[in-house]
Amino acid sequence: MVGRDIDGAETYRISELAALAGVTKRTVDYYTNLGLLTPARSCSNYRYYDENALKRLIFIVDCKKQRLALSDIKDRLENQFPSSAKLDDEIGNLALEIDHMNQNISGILHRFERLKPEDRDKLKSKLPPEKLAVFQSFMLLLS
């Protein structure tokens, strides 16, 4: 019997998940112990799997049909279904890169503004049209 979590999303007990993916309960248990699948636990300690776990299990089954090693499957799973912690790290790194770029752009614009008007015009004339448009956009954004 398919259940629902507190958000209303479908959940599956181990036997239901196994049947939907065409594997045994023991296989689901094995993949869970390896960390390839992550169940939620009920207050009575039953394991429940969500729709994402079903997609992951079907992906694992497809990879096994291609005779991929579980270590390779784990790598592919991380790329196919990134964890929220990994995405948080990537977003944090991206935010740092954006801050660094903003500082660089601000420094360049500050030096540009200190140039004589004729030197500014000369510099602008050397830029291709698409780069000039980007430069002017940055000037507007940061002014």
UniProtKB/Swiss-Prot annotation:
Gene3D superfamilies in the record: 1.10.1660.10
Superkingdom of origin: Bacteria
Coiled-coil residues: none
DNA-binding region: 14-33
Residues of the HTH merR-type domain: 11-79
Annotated keywords: Activator, DNA-binding, Transcription, Transcription regulation
One Pfam family recorded for the sequence: MerR_1
UniProt GO molecular function: DNA binding; DNA-binding transcription factor activity
Record-level GO BP terms: regulation of DNA-templated transcription
InterPro entries: DNA-bd_dom_put_sf (IPR009061), MerR-type_HTH_dom (IPR000551), MerR_fam (IPR047057)
UniProt xrefs under PANTHER family: HTH-TYPE TRANSCRIPTIONAL REGULATOR CUER, REDOX-CYCLING DRUG-SENSING TRANSCRIPTIONAL ACTIVATOR SOXR
Misc note: Binds a DNA inverted repeat of copZA operon.
Record's function text: Transcriptional activator of the copZA operon.
Protein name stated in the entry: HTH-type transcriptional regulator CueR
Organism of origin: Bacillus subtilis (strain 168)
Lineage summary: Bacteria, Bacillati, Bacillota, Bacilli, Bacillales
Gene: cueR
